[in-house]
Design a protein with these regions (language model features):
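Non-catalytic, well-ordered alpha-helical scaffold segments
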Residues: 55, 59, 93, 97, ...
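Short alpha-helical scaffolding segments that buttress acidic/His motifs in well-ordered protein cores
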Residues: 99-103, 146-153
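N-terminal intrinsically disordered/low-complexity leader segments
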Residues: 1-9
Length: 194
C-alpha cells in the first residue's frame, strides 16, 4: 500500500472514529464538520475531500458502527436461542447511542444504513427466529419478540443513568433490576421457542 493510500485510510479512520464518538452525544443534527475535524485532529476540508461532506461521513460512520455491532454480537454467538448474559448495549454502546440520536433527530436515513448494508442484527435475528419455527416469513409475534428486545436494550442504553439517579439504585437493586431486564428481553423469544 502506498504512503498516500495509507495516509488516506488513516485520515478516514480518524474521521469515522471521531464522528462515531461524537454523534452519540450530540446527535447528527447538532454535530458539525468542524467538531468532527477538530476531534480527529485534521483539517475540516478533508471531510469534503474524502466523504463529500457531513452526510457522506455520517453514512460511513453509521455503517462502521453497524459492522462493529454485528461483529461483536456474532463473536458472542448472539441468536434467538442465546441473547447472552450481558446487556447488548454494554457491548457496543456507541452504536446504540448513535441510533437513538438519529431517531430523535429524525434522521432515519442513518438508521437505514444498517438495513441497506445488510448489517441489521434485528433483521438477522428476526430471520433466524422464522427459520427456527420453519415459517416462510416472520409472524407478528416474531416481530413483536424482536421489538420488545430492541425496546428493552435501547431503553437501558438511554436511561440507565437516569434510572440509577431517580430510583437511587443500590448494588442489590441493580442486581434485581438486571434479572428482570434479562427476563423482559427474552420474554417474546421464550414464548415463541417453547
Amino acid at each position: 500500500m502506498s504512503n498516500n493510500r495509507r495516509g488516506r485510510k488513516n485520515v478516514e479512520k480518524k474521521l469515522i472514529d471521531s464522528a462515531a464518538f461524537l454523534v452519540g452525544s450530540v446527535g447528527p443534527n447538532q454535530l458539525t464538520v468542524r467538531d468532527i475535524a477538530d476531534h480527529a485532529g485534521v483539517n475540516h476540508a478533508q471531510i469534503h475531500h474524502y466523504f463529500g461532506g457531513k452526510k457522506g461521513l455520517l453514512i460511513a460512520t453509521y455503517k462502521q458502527l453497524a459492522f462493529t455491532h454485528v461483529q461483536q454480537l456474532e463473536r458472542r454467538k448472539i441468536s434467538p436461542k442465546n441473547l447472552g448474559d450481558e446487556p447488548l448495549a454494554s457491548i457496543t454502546d456507541d452504536y446504540f447511542k448513535a441510533i437513538i440520536r438519529a431517531v430523535l433527530d429524525g434522521q432515519m436515513y442513518l438508521v437505514r444504513v444498517q438495513i441497506d448494508s445488510n448489517l441489521s442484527m434485528s433483521r438477522t435475528t428476526l430471520k433466524q427466529l422464522a427459520e427456527l419455527k420453519n415459517a416462510k416469513k416472520p409472524t407478528s409475534e416474531m416481530k413483536s419478540a424482536v421489538a420488545i428486545a430492541m425496546v428493552v436494550e435501547f431503553g437501558l442504553s438511554s436511561m440507565e443513568q437516569y434510572i440509577d439517579e431517580v430510583l437511587e439504585m443500590t448494588a442489590n437493586d441493580k442486581k434485581v433490576f438486571m434479572k428482570y431486564f434479562f427476563e423482559a428481553r427474552s420474554l417474546g423469544f421464550d414464548k415463541i421457542l417453547k
